[in-house]
Amino acid sequence: MSRRNPARNQERILKAATAEFARYGLGGARVDRIAARAGANKRMLYYYYGNKEDLFLAVLEASYARIRRAELGLHLEDLDPAQGVRRLVEFTWDYYLKHPEFLTLLNSENLHRARHLKRSRDIAAMHSPLIALLRDLLLRGERAGRFRKGVDPVQLYISIAALGYF
């Protein structure tokens, strides 16, 4: 691992940590295995991330960032409201199937009652653009008489995510 390319080093560490945490959970994950898989030493992991819990948070944030980027790439704002909601449901289902590590990371974090995500400065900001798009779809659908009035976009997204998750 090159010391002269911090971004690349962090990317390798996050990739290795994602695999480790997805397989073993936070409690079973070992920094030694993450370092070996990343081609780094433990000191480098601690230098970039401080401790295992902060590395886990970084993995969660990176995982959420990936799904949010993919969701925003759907361009739901360009679709008919019903098509947009349907597209988001289909995408969410497909994403979970293609990225089972995302669900196992969520399982691990759920066991800790979202302790790590609550400390994140970035997670809420990641959700906002998607919720705004979903709110717009719902309002457009409501005005067109296709959706009932008063659907909460946050609750709808939680329902969509839960359908794919469970």
Walk through the language-model features, giving the residues of each.
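Hydrophobic alpha-helical connector segments
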Residues: 72-104, 125-127, 133, 153-160
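Hydrophobic alpha-helical bundle segments that form small-molecule/ligand-binding pockets
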Residues: 117, 127-157, 163
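Short helix-capping/turn signature of helix-turn-helix
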Residues: 49, 108-114
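Helix-turn-helix
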Residues: 12, 20-54, 58
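Hydrophobic/aromatic residues within well-ordered alpha-helical segments
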Residues: 52, 59, 63, 67, ...
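Short coil/turn segments at alpha/beta junctions that flank glycine-rich nucleotide-binding fingerprints
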Residues: 23-27, 78, 99, 144
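Phosphate/oxyanion-binding loops and surfaces in catalytic or ligand/nucleic-acid-binding neighborhoods
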Residues: 62, 66, 95-99, 113, ...
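Generic hydrophobic, amphipathic alpha-helix propensity
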Residues: 9-17, 34, 59-63, 67, ...
